[in-house]
Structures are given as structure tokens and as C-alpha cells.
């Protein structure tokens, strides 16, 4: 086996020793070792036939991986699709098969708001395409969904068996054109222009489209929450056109989070001044939304809900430092509001969303975006206030450990108008995302008393 990647720590795991003995494995940086292996086992020439087979061989998912994933989704309620989601799912399968048949590059853009089932469709598509002998991966910038899905899908299997199905978008600048049959990109609004802290590559979107015969982008424009977030429908279209790829677009309308209330989603967008929407009556929905005056009361309510299902969490805007010294200490208090004290999520163990004790820690946008709970308690920090009859965003109230606003200070010096627009988008989208993580309810507490009053009035007026 030859792997042109730098995942040697995974593929060379001691768990795979027996397999590697039968099928020698070479990873990036081991060219001299591969050269010696070829010299040893190919004693005479064959008119370059072996080299041709290596160069033109098609990468396929292994039989053991296909056997492993065949039962992963069976009976798993969290990945069960509804009829409206199945329409997009079936179209993905059809387009992927068509690409295999005519070898034409295609890009699908699927737009959908919170709770429309983007991730459910994405995971189902990856599993089913692999079962059809196609080679591809589930891609997302945010590590939280990847880690949670690996845990939930693995079940009793070793996680290493399915870990290779999930990847970040940072390595594709190293790939050759059409190395993959398909790539399913979830949370595509979080893609960056360049990769990693060293800004490698040219354009992540261009690199993903180039690397795959068929690329699917799932996007929610209201969930761009980082200064460097680059993914947009217009950029997907532009990069697809530059590579002569056919573009197919879908929009997912019905949402199944927030007790299926499209009205609640619309109200949140309207209340956060993201867009003007028609008001609705809170009495008409069963979603449990409340404004709580004391963060200690909010914590007690969420703990009570968590006792029922294990799926309730407290989330907050990133306005408190995540101190390095306390990241593994559950008794370290990062967030202090009067006599209310809690720590941010711990930097160890299981992913925050499914860790057994994480109800006693506070999650942020980076540990919860792309995931859902039954109930969420959201603490809105001083980065969002209500002054002079309007919402005011203030990136200076964000913690220094929050990288999502890095770059704004410089941009404010160069282009204040653009900086203000991006700042507002980041902060409002962050709270929109946090407030739409709950399936059954959302309780909020605002550090700014005027914002607390504004939201209460918005409920009364609805």
C-alpha cells in the first residue's frame, strides 16, 4: 500500500502490525525505503507495465472498511433521514454514479439553515458511496462534529477502523486532480482561503474541487463565525466554473431542530437583526424558549434537563479566557459572573458534546457548531449589548484566546466599514448558532441587562 499523506501515526499504529506484515506500507517521506523495496522484488523489467498499473490504478475503499461500515447506520436513530432529506441524499448518489460513468467533474451546493439535516445527509451519503466501491471522505473544518460522529458510529468497533472516513480540509493542496471519487464537505461556510497556521496552499475550495471528481458543499450562510471563514455560494460557483465543473444547487427548507419550528428560527434571525422576517406567536409552538435572570438558575434548569436525557449543555460566547493552566482541571473557574462560576470545556477525554460530565462545563462555538442537544442554556457575553435602541457588537470583549476575531484590529485601521460588517457578522452569527443547537428548548442569560430587556420585549411582541 502506498499512501501520499502524512497520517503515518494513524496508519502505522501497532494495531495494524499484522496487516502491514502481509502488505508492506509506505507513507510520505519514505521514498528511499520504497525504492529499496521495488529493487528487491522487481528483478527484471516488464516494459513499465507495473509502473503503469501503479500510476493508473484506482484507489478503492478496502473490503474490511466496507464490511465495517455496512452496519454502522442500521438502527442508529441519530442518522435516520426524513423524506425531504432523502431527496437530496438520492440526488447525491445519482450524481456520484454519473460522475463515475462519464468522468465529468461536478459540484453540488446544498444550502440549508440550522436543523435542516445537512450533517445527517452528509454522513449517510459518505457511508453509502463507500459501500458502492467509491473512494471519498467526510470533510469539515470544525473537529467537534468529526470526533462526535466517529464516537457515535464506531459503536463497539475500534475507532481507528473508521477514522480515515473523516478529515479536515487542510491537506488537499497536496493532492493530485481527481484523487477522490467524492468529497462531502459539511459546514462548508467554515472553509478557509489558505490552510493551517502557516497559510499553505492557494484556496481550500479550489483544492477540494480539484481533488475530487464529485464535491458536495453543505452551507448555512448564517453560520460563518470566524474572521477567516471563506466559504460562500458565490465562491463555490466561481471555483467550479474555473475547473469546468457542472454545478447543481439545492436548498433544504424544512428544519427538524427547535421542535421543527421554522418560526423560531425566523424569529431568532429577526431578533438578532440578521434579516427581517415575519413575526409569529410563541404560543403557537412547543419549543421551550426562556430568558433567565440568574445564571445559577439557568445552570440548575439545564442540569435538571440533562438528568432526563443526558443531552443538555450550557454554552457561552467566547468572552472569558480559556486559561491554559486550568484546561484539564474541572474545578478551575474560567467564567465568573457574580457568584456564578464554571469552567470552560476540558481539553482532554471524550468530545465535549458527548462527555458524561460536560454538563458541568461550558461549551463554546468551536466545540458545539454542527452538533445538537435536547436543551441548551446560552450565556450571552458583553460582546453583544443593546444600546440606543440597537444591537451593538464589540469584538474587544472577546477573550484573547479566541482566534475567531484575530485580524479585526488590523482591518479596523485599514478599512473600518468592512471591519465593522465582519465583526457584526461573526458575533451575531455566533449567538444565532448557539441559540439553535437545542432540539426542544433554549434558555438564555444576558450579561448586558438592556439586552436582557430587549429580548424579553421581543418575545412579548411576537
Where are the regions that the model predicts?
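Hydrophobic anchor at the beta1->P-loop junction of P-loop NTPases
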Residues: 110
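Conserved lysine of the Walker
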Residues: 118
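Single conserved hydrophobic/aromatic residue that forms the stacking wall/gate
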Residues: 2-11
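C-terminal accessory regions
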Residues: 216, 361-365, 369-462
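Conserved helicase/translocase motor-coupling segment
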Residues: 122, 226-231, 245-266, 273-390
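N-terminal pre-P-loop "Q-motif" helix
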Residues: 62, 77-106
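Conserved P-loop NTPase catalytic core
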Residues: 158-305, 310
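Interdomain "pre-motor" coupling segment immediately N-terminal to P-loop NTPase/helicase cores
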Residues: 10-67
Amino acid at each position: 500500500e502506498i499512501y501520499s499523506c502524512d497520517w503515518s501515526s494513524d496508519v502505522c499504529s501497532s494495531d495494524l502490525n499484522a496487516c502491514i506484515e502481509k502488505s508492506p506500507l509506505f507513507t510520505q517521506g519514505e521514498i528511499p525505503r520504497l525504492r529499496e523495496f521495488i529493487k528487491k522484488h522487481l528483478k527484471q523489467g516488464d516494459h513499465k507495465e507495473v509502473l503503469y498499473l501503479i500510476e493508473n490504478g484506482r484507489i478503492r475503499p478496502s473490503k474490511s472498511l466496507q464490511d465495517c461500515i455496512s452496519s454502522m447506520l442500521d438502527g442508529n436513530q441519530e442518522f435516520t433521514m426524513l423524506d425531504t432529506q432523502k431527496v437530496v441524499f438520492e440526488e447525491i448518489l445519482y450524481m456520484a454514479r454519473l460522475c463515475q460513468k462519464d468522468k465529468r467533474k461536478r459540484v453540488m451546493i446544498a444550502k440549508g439553515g440550522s436543523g435542516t439535516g445537512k450533517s445527517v445527509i452528509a454522513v449517510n451519503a459518505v457511508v453509502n458511496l463507500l459501500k458502492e466501491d467509491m473512494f471519498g471522505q467526510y470533510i469539515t473544518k470544525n473537529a467537534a462534529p468529526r470526533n462526535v460522529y466517529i464516537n457515535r458510529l464506531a459503536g463497539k468497533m475500534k475507532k481507528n477502523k473508521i477514522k480515515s472516513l473523516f478529515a479536515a480540509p487542510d491537506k488537499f493542496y497536496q493532492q493530485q486532480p481527481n484523487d477522490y471519487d467524492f468529497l462531502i464537505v459539511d459546514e462548508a461556510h467554515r472553509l478557509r482561503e489558505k490552510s493551517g497556521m502557516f497559510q499553505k496552499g492557494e484556496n481550500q475550495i479550489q483544492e477540494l474541487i480539484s481533488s475530487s471528481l464529485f464535491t458536495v458543499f453543505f452551507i448555512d450562510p448564517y453560520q460563518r463565525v470566524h474572521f477567516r471563514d471563506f466559504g460562500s455560494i458565490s465562491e463555490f460557483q466561481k471555483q467550479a466554473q474555473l475547473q469546468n465543473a457542472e454545478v447543481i444547487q439545492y436548498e433544504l427548507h424544512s428544519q427538524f431542530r427547535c421542535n421543527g419550528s421554522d418560526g423560531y428560527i425566523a424569529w431568532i434571525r429577526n431578533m438578532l437583526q440578521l434579516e427581517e422576517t415575519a413575526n409569529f406567536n410563541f404560543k403557537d409552538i412547543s419549543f421551550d424558549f426562556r430568558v433567565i435572570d440568574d445564571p445559577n438558575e439557568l445552570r440548575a434548569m439545564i442540569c435538571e434537563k440533562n438528568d432526563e436525557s443526558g443531552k443538555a449543555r450550557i454554552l457561552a460566547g467566547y468572552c472569558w479566557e480559556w486559561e491554559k493552566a486550568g484546561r484539564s482541571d474541572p474545578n478551575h473557574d474560567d467564567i465568573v459572573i457574580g457568584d456564578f462560576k464554571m469552567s470552560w470545556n476540558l481539553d482532554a477525554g471524550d468530545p465535549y458534546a458527548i462527555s458524561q460530565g460536560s454538563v458541568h462545563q461550558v461549551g463554546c462555538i468551536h466545540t458545539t457548531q454542527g452538533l445538537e442537544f435536547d436543551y441548551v442554556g446560552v450565556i450571552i457575553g458583553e460582546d453583544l449589548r443593546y444600546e440606543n435602541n440597537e444591537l451593538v457588537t464589540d469584538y474587544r470583549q472577546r477573550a484573547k484566546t479566541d482566534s475567531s476575531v484575530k485580524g479585526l484590529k488590523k482591518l479596523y485601521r485599514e478599512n473600518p466599514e468592512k471591519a465593522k460588517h465582519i465583526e457584526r457578522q461573526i458575533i451575531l452569527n455566533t449567538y444565532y448558532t448557539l441559540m439553535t443547537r437545542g432540539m426542544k428548548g433554549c434558555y438564555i442569560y444576558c450579561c448586558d441587562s438592556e439586552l436582557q430587556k430587549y429580548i424579553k420585549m421581543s418575545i412579548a411582541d411576537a
